[in-house]
Every structure is written in structure tokens, then in C-alpha cells.
């Protein structure tokens, strides 16, 4: 029986690949070993998996060098994706420059940003070190100073694996080192791209895996144009997170989370004035006589908010028709804080289908939850205007959203003044037919008659078969 190594390098992969049944078909058909970063907040949970084979460690100094190289490559290749530039603007805290207020106050914010960006390891030093004169020298020195992780090397060299699989956001040292080890040991590597924007928002691979599993056709094109993969290296897999949305379409309706009709407002990890927008939405509901009197707003802030210029703390006492999402409220009651990231909190995916399905309309800044809402056949309003605080969250930087306007019921709100009219239209939206919606969303997310575990097993079999064929043909 072929032996496969699966490496888990982030807590979110514990939720997306271990808590789901993503690996179930592999576990039935192959001898599977799962290893994980021992510093994970959910490391103990991983160790309880029947396929668990051990932990590996990541040296902080080495990780910093990897991340510096990733950021230099991001800047160097920024013309390949507008989101690369956005990432640098965000990392350098560009949004902290004030665009409103007295001139002196705005000028001082610029000076303050320059000082902070000079000290920030992700700030001004990135474009300097990635400049044409310095990049070849600096990147070469960094690559030579990055040996393969010894723990990963030990796992790969002592266990004679037939294949190595790893989920990745395309911005981690583990994927680089496993790709290098695979080449050294003649073991095929399969990288599972985890999220929608990963191929256009992080960096470019400086050591590519042999094969890559992506969400859909859009990501396939990005893998070729941004990262230089060949068509033969790319497999359309989808994501294990979303199988439940398609299953929920035909399943009996579950008990509703809320007894009242609601507009769902989903927050973004990226900075956006969500509290101000909630006030605006509440005023719209209260001033429009055509809106049902019992229609409320459920606010689901992103659990891993980044620092923002606008108020971020939701206080129910400031609203009359807005309720905090129950799952997030429970997390806040347990200690989760706005504008902070707690990797141990990984929201249960089973909560999402009914939350999205039961919403009258879903509204929010540009976040993957809007795409998930479209999969649940809900009308969606994507807020793509300048919110008055954060100038770099506009639609022009989020290339993965290109084409979403073709999805039935999905609209972009490019001006705050249009929100009322678009909400009115969304509330009057005719029922969205699954077959019509799927025709458009399938460009972003591959869909067929198989589940994600079945597709992953099918792709793995194809990779193993092609590797055996290549080995036979290479023999004298």
C-alpha cells in the first residue's frame, strides 16, 4: 500500500482538513501519516488523530528569513497581481495615514507613518531590498542561508514515502522545504491551496511543488500566470470547507439560529468601518416604510480582525435593530477580542450553512464569506467603496473578486449612497436558481458529482500513477 505524508502547518488547516472528512478517502486507501507544527494552538487535537505520526519544530530565526524572502518576492513580482501591492500597503500600515481632518493632523500622520514604516520589518525596507540593484544579492544570500528543516528532513528520509501532501496559503516555509525534500528524494509533492485569494495575495513560490490543487478555473489560470505552473501540474479540487453548502441545499431545514428575519452583515479581517456601516444600515431599515418592521441585522465580525482606524468594538446598546452573531458572541464571552487573532479559535464550519441560508440578504466588505453566501443562493451586496478611513480596501486590489458580478444576485456597492437602493433591490430579489448560479460560481469553485475527499483521493492516485510511469520511463 502506498505511503503518504500529510503535513499540517497552521491551526486553520486543523479545522479545514482534519475536522472535516477531507482526508477520509486517503486514510481508507493509503497508509497515511499526519505530522504537524508542535507550536500549533490545536497541537493536542492533531495528536489525537489515528494517523498522527509526530511533530516538527520551526526555528523562529529561520522563519523570519523565510518571511523576508517571501515579502521581497511579493514586491518584486507585484505587477503580476495588484493584491501583492495591497499586501505591502497593509503590512506597512499605510491605512493609518489620515485622509480626513485638519491639514496639520493629516501631515503629522504621514510623518508618523514614515517613522514607523522605517522601523517596521514589513515596511520601507521591503521595496528597498527588493529593488533591481539589491534584490539579486539579498535574495541569493537569503536562499543560501535557508537549509531544509531538519525535522521535516528526518520524517521524509527515514519513512520512504510515496507522496507528500500539504495544505498551504503559499506563504509558509513548510511548503518550500517539503517541495525541496520531494525533489531531493524523488517523492512527488502535492500542495493544496487553502483559500480563494492565496495565489494572488501572498507571494510567488521560489520552490514549487510538483503538483498543486486549486479551488477552480480562476485559480488554475492564476497558478500559471502568477507562479509559472504548467497546466499538467494543476488539479481542480475545490475546498473541503464548502461541501456542506451543497449538501444543505437538499437537506431538511435545520432549526433556525434566529426566530426573526434578518440581514446578515459579515465583517472582514481587513480594515473597514463596519460599526459605522451598521449604523447606516439601521437608519435605512428604520426610515424605509417598505421594510418589514421585524427585519433585523445580524452582525458577524471576522474573528481575526486586523487593526483599523475606525471603531471596532460592537456594543448592542448603541443599536436598536442589530444583534451580534451567536457564535461570535459566545467566543467574545469566552475571551476572544476584536482586532486580535487567537489561532485556537477556529469557528465550527457546521454553523455556517443555516446562518447563510436563512439570511434575507448578506452584506459586507470584500471577504470570502460573500462568496460562501452566493453558494448558499443568497442575494449579496459587496461593499467596495472607500469607507472614509481605509483607502486600500477597494475592489481594485482584490483581483479574486473579478467576475463575481456575473453571479446571480451578487452586486458590488461602489458608493455608500447606493446602499439603500441596492438593499431594496436585494430584498426584492427573485429566488436564485441553483443551476444558474452554479454555472457562474463553478469558475471560482470546481464542482462535480464527487465530494472533496473523493476528488483528493482521485488526484492522489493520478499523481502516484504518473510518478510510477515517470520512474519506469527514466530507467535505462
Pin down the residues of each PLM region.
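Short N-terminal targeting/anchoring amphipathic segment
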Residues: 5, 96, 102, 153-172, ...
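Acidic donor-binding loop of glycosyltransferase active sites
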Residues: 161-163, 337-348, 353-367
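C-terminal amphipathic helix plus adjacent low-complexity
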Residues: 268-271, 336-338, 408-476
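Conserved N-terminal ligand/cofactor-binding loop architecture of enzyme catalytic domains
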Residues: 33-152, 313, 331-334
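Nucleotide-activated donor-dependent transferases that construct or modify glycoconjugates
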Residues: 1-12, 37-38, 58-61, 72-81, ...
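Conserved catalytic-core segment of nucleotide-activated headgroup transferases in glycan assembly
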Residues: 15-24, 242-342, 413
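Active-site-proximal region of nucleotide-activated glycan assembly enzymes
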Residues: 53-54, 124, 135-150, 167-173, ...
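Catalytic binding pocket for nucleotide-activated donors in carbohydrate/polymer assembly enzymes
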Residues: 206-209, 231, 368-445
Amino acid at each position: 500500500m502506498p505511503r503518504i505524508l500529510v503535513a499540517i502547518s497552521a491551526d486553520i488547516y486543523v479545522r479545514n482538513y482534519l475536522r472535516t472528512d477531507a482526508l477520509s478517502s486517503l486514510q481508507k486507501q493509503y497508509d497515511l501519516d499526519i505530522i504537524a507544527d508542535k507550536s500549533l494552538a490545536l497541537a493536542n487535537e492533531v495528536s489525537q488523530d489515528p494517523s498522527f505520526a509526530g511533530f516538527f519544530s520551526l526555528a523562529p530565526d529561520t522563519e523570519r528569513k523565510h518571511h523576508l524572502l517571501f515579502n521581497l518576492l511579493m514586491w518584486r513580482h507585484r505587477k503580476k497581481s495588484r493584491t501583492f501591492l495591497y499586501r505591502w500597503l497593509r503590512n506597512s500600515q499605510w491605512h493609518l495615514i489620515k485622509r480626513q481632518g485638519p491639514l496639520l493632523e493629516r501631515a503629522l500622520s504621514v510623518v508618523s507613518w514614515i517613522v514607523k514604516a522605517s522601523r517596521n520589518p514589513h515596511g520601507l525596507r521591503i521595496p528597498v531590498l527588493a529593488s533591481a540593484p539589491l534584490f539579486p544579492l539579498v535574495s541569493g544570500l537569503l536562499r543560501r542561508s535557508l537549509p531544509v528543516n531538519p525535522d521535516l528532513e528526518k520524517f521524509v528520509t527515514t519513512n520512504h514515502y510515496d507522496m507528500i501532501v500539504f495544505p498551504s496559503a503559499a506563504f509558509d516555509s513548510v511548503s518550500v522545504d517539503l517541495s525541496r525534500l520531494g525533489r531531493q528524494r524523488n517523492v512527488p509533492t502535492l500542495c493544496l491551496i487553502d483559500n480563494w485569494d492565496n495565489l494572488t495575495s501572498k507571494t510567488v513560490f521560489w520552490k514549487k511543488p510538483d503538483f498543486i490543487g486549486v479551488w477552480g478555473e480562476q485559480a488554475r489560470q492564476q497558478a500559471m500566470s502568477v507562479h509559472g505552473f504548467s497546466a499538467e501540474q494543476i488539479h481542480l479540487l475545490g475546498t473541503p470547507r464548502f461541501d456542506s453548502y451543497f449538501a444543505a441545499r437538499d437537506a431538511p431545514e435545520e432549526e433556525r439560529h434566529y426566530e426573526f428575519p434578518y440581514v446578515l452583515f459579515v465583517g472582514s479581517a481587513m480594515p473597514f468601518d463596519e460599526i459605522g456601516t451598521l449604523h447606516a444600515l439601521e437608519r435605512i431599515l428604520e426610515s424605509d416604510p417598505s421594510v418589514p418592521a421585524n427585519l433585523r441585522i445580524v452582525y458577524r465580525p471576522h474573528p481575526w480582525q486586523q487593526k483599523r482606524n475606525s471603531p471596532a468594538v460592537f456594543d448592542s446598546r448603541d443599536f436598536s435593530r442589530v444583534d451580534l452573531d451567536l457564535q461570535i458572541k459566545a467566543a467574545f464571552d469566552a475571551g476572544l477580542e476584536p482586532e486580535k487573532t487567537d489561532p485556537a479559535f477556529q469557528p465550527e464550519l457546521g454553523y455556517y450553512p443555516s446562518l447563510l441560508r436563512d439570511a434575507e440578504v448578506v452584506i459586507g466588505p470584500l471577504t470570502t464569506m460573500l462568496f460562501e453566501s452566493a453558494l448558499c443562493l443568497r442575494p449579496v451586496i459587496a461593499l467596495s467603496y472607500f469607507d472614509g478611513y481605509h483607502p486600500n480596501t477597494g475592489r481594485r486590489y482584490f483581483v479574486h473578486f473579478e467576475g463575481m458580478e456575473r453571479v446571480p444576485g451578487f452586486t458590488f456597492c461602489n458608493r455608500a449612497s447606493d446602499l439603500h437602493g441596492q438593499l431594496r433591490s436585494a430584498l426584492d430579489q427573485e429566488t436564485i436558481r441553483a443551476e444558474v448560479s452554479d454555472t457562474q460560481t463553478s469558475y471560482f469553485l470546481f464542482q462535480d458529482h464527487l465530494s472533496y475527499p473523493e476528488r483528493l483521493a482521485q488526484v492522489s492516485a493520478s499523481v502516484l500513477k504518473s510518478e510510477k510511469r515517470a520512474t519506469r520511463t527514466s530507467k535505462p
